[in-house]
């Protein structure tokens, strides 16, 4: 019975996915993923990216966000991206494949960033979802805490942090933590984000000294 339920749920997800207008637009435009449209909407409202910036992209695969940011920061900019999954190369993106939770991978990522601070840290990381909020939310909160830790390590004063968060236990505390570190914090729910999804995007700008 459980397998039948999973099969029906998977079929519904696939049907919803391929009928999604943003998935269809991404395919037509040759984009890596529908996430490109989420970031485009955030950029239109919050202007996070400018030419010449250095950006860290966590949870980068398949590359929708990196693909978008390249168009905003130009040839003088730089993107350092990381994901546990493989990602096809993108010109202008320095990609590291590995588990961000692993100390050796984190060390390698920090080495790629180097001594200079970055202007934006963005995270689209998410755990493998079980469908059970009591399991999924804590896993997600662990990842977003790691992303915030990366901000503390590499983000320049005045820099910005963009992170996908799933609303649930720990969300309010996490939001308070971000507000203590940044001068302006907004919550965005892009049109390309499915309405039934718990995901929202926290946009934090003006990292405090």
Curated annotation (Swiss-Prot):
Sequence positions that bind S-adenosyl-L-methionine: 63, 65, 83, 99, 124
Entry keyword annotation includes Transferase: yes
GO MF annotation list: rRNA (uridine-2'-O-)-methyltransferase activity
EC number annotated for this UniProt entry: 2.1.1.166
UniProt-listed Gene3D superfamilies: Vaccinia Virus protein VP39
Pfam family, one: FtsJ
Cellular compartment(s): Cytoplasm
Alphabetically ordered keywords of this record: Cytoplasm, Methyltransferase, rRNA processing, S-adenosyl-L-methionine, Transferase
Name of the top EC class for this enzyme: transferase
Catalytic activity entry: uridine(2552) in 23S rRNA + S-adenosyl-L-methionine = 2'-O-methyluridine(2552) in 23S rRNA + S-adenosyl-L-homocysteine + H(+)
Domain of life: Bacteria
GO annotations of cellular component type: cytoplasm
Active site: 164
Record has Calcium as a keyword: no
Main localization, broad class: cytoplasm
NCBIfam families (alphabetical): PRK11188.1, rrmJ
Described purpose of this protein according to its UniProt entry: Specifically methylates the uridine in position 2552 of 23S rRNA at the 2'-O position of the ribose in the fully assembled 50S ribosomal subunit.
Family to which the UniProt record says this protein belongs: Belongs to the class I-like SAM-binding methyltransferase superfamily. RNA methyltransferase RlmE family.
Name the UniProt record assigns to this protein: Ribosomal RNA large subunit methyltransferase E
Originating species: Serratia proteamaculans (strain 568)
